[in-house]
């Protein structure tokens, strides 16, 4: 049984701020060491070559280079491949 507040309740109207998760640097982009590549909850993407994983599962570049996404044994990986001056 409802007890008053039939139309629109003043008890509503709250929401949490978005977590801003997702891929921050896409395939082919050139990054510097320390740049965040993916913000995630859990390991949707796994760290590959020259990529580190933070305590909150954030993936970051450990060396400069180009971002490369790939799959290995059913897992998605993020790698950083070194680029020469001519390619960059």
Curated annotation (Swiss-Prot):
Q: Which GO terms describe its biological process?
A: translation
Q: Give the range the annotation lists for the signal sequence.
A: none
Q: Name one Pfam family in it.
A: Ribosomal_L27
List keywords of the entry alphabetically: Ribonucleoprotein, Ribosomal protein
- GO molecular function ontology, one term from the record: structural constituent of ribosome
A GO-annotated cellular component = cytosolic large ribosomal subunit
Taxonomically, the superkingdom here is Bacteria
Which ranges form a coiled coil?
none
The entry sums up its family as follows: Belongs to the bacterial ribosomal protein bL27 family.
Output this protein's name.
Large ribosomal subunit protein bL27
Q: Which organism is it from?
A: Mycolicibacterium vanbaalenii (strain DSM 7251 / JCM 13017 / BCRC 16820 / KCTC 9966 / NRRL B-24157 / PYR-1) (Mycobacterium vanbaalenii)
